Structure formats: C-alpha cells, structure tokens
C-alpha cells in the first residue's frame, strides 16, 4: 500500500467554482493523476476541504477521471453511502481497506443519502463536530446578556418558536454559532472542548467493522485543519476521540493530514495514529487558474492574474505559509503489518524546499543531515505528550511500538 491524500480536484472546468473554497480553489488537469501513479501511489483519499471547490460537477468529474484510470480512492462519492464506503486494494500480501473522512469542510460539499424518491448528493464523507465552551455562572450570564442586547440568536429563536428547529438543551447558551454550557459547580474549571457528532462517528465505526470483516488491514484517513486552542500543532479533542474509536473498532492505523504541518504521533493500543504527517507535494502558489471570486475577495479586479493574486495574499512573501518553516517539513511513514498489526514503523523526514523559487517550492525530497535531525526532533517533541518514543538513527526515525491503553 502506498497512500496519498489528493487535496485537489481533477477536471477541465466541468464544475463551476463554489462560492467558498478551501482557501485556494484547487483544480488541475486530470493528466496529473498519471503523475501520481508514476510516483507509485496506489490508494488515495479524496475527502478534504477542497473536495467541493468546484461544486458537485467538480466532485463527479474527479470521480470519473479516477475511475477511468482504475485508481482506488475513498472519501467522496455520488452519494453519502458511496463516499463513506471503504475502498479495497488487493496486494500480494493481503487486502487493504481505506476509509476517508474530513472534518474541515463547507457544508455544501457534504454528500447526501439516496432517498426513496429523491437522488443522493455527490460530495464528501463528513466528520462533523460540536464545540462547547464550559463557563461559570457569571460568564454564562454575560453570554445571555450579549445575546439579548445584540439579538444575535433572533433568527434561531424564531425557528424554534415556529417548530423548524429544536430548543436549546437545558444549561446551554448559543451565541452566534458558539455553544456555551454552564458548569455544574462554580469551582469547575472553565474550558473549551470538542466532540465528534454521533451520527458521523457511528457511520464510520460501522464501516470500519465491516471492512475488518472483508480485509486484512483497515486504514482510516482523516483530514483536519482544526486545532486545540490557538496552537496549530496540537490536534483538537474530537480528533483524538475519533481516532481512538477507529482503532477500537478495528483500524490498524489512522493517517491524519490537513494543517499542512506535522502533529504528534500516538501509538494507541499498538496502532499508529498520525495526527498529521504534513505535506508531500505542496504547489498551491502555481495553480493555473482562480475564479473571479478569489480576486474580488482581495479587492482586486476580476481579470487579475494568478501570480499577482498570490503576491497579494502573501504580502509579497512576508506572511502566511511561505514564512513558516514547519509548513515545508513532513515525514513519510513506512511500516510492516503482520496479523493486522503494525510491527515495524520507520519515519523518513522530507523537506519541500521553503527557500526555493515559487516554481520549485513544494516539491518533496528526502531531508539529510542537520535538516533531517531537526524534523525528527520536532516530531519527537510533538509526540512526547502521547508517550511515543522516536529514535533518530541514520537519518530516519524509528518508533518503539507497544500496547498503550
């Protein structure tokens, strides 16, 4: 198995640009899929925050181009059932199942179920979550007062009154899309937490259990940009909860990606959980086209060229991804599986050439020397809270595996 996250749509404008994108409206010519095969990849995730950049037309065109090439993918489909279904790869040593989900998304990109008398909706397999802010009585009263003064909940209150929406749970206070919950005791610590929506967690767990019956190993791919608090390198609680549930259901590994940088590695009950392995190919600055919405949103004319737009977005290379060295660092994990369990795990550090020219920046190469040591040391630090032991040895990282309850 050689896995990749396809954070791109592949078509020739068969879909119109969506009103909102994952950041850059991501589209390239379908022939680029042939390059992915030449790289040696054979199993792909397609559920991410760019899946819906070109609407349903972009989703279905990408699916068609993948299918025409016999490329095995999971995470998007013509219906929710298709998008959430495991994809199977046959190898000489056994069958691998892949399930793809994304938490970072535009609601319009979510796939829909087939009804009795209505068609399903093309899109991605979602992992939605609920954010809760636990506060004391004084701060809860402040939220109530803000809601009253600003009338920020007026539309929601109207929908509740007319029966189109459910009442707020007791002890909770929504405020413009945020959910505040009153602590049981005044001495309870105030905190923020997130939890996966039960409907999405249940659907994914059920598919893992089915895939476990049908395959020798099951891999779950999850695309998550969300973070805990303000630290982009720390995964949110709902992602940890989700990953543990996946392993409990039978997943051999969970591969996370999304924040464009490394996050910690956890060994949970003997299974590796990569909260983010970073980028591999990251050429976001050299897309051929962007819709007028992108330019107008920056206060630029609709006929602006892509290069000028990228200069404006990065303030001529002084802000954003370009100036953050961790965006241009990653690892390529390599492991051996026996009896459905990961037995040997090696991490190959990769650099994407932060200081290269725009045309070359984002292409991967194996890191060497001090650069390799720095990447592995960074990942080791991120993984320490999980008790994971990473040993740097001859330019690669070796992970000590063991059952960790």
Segments (PLM) and residue ranges:
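Acidic, metal/ion-coordinating pockets
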Residues: 1-405
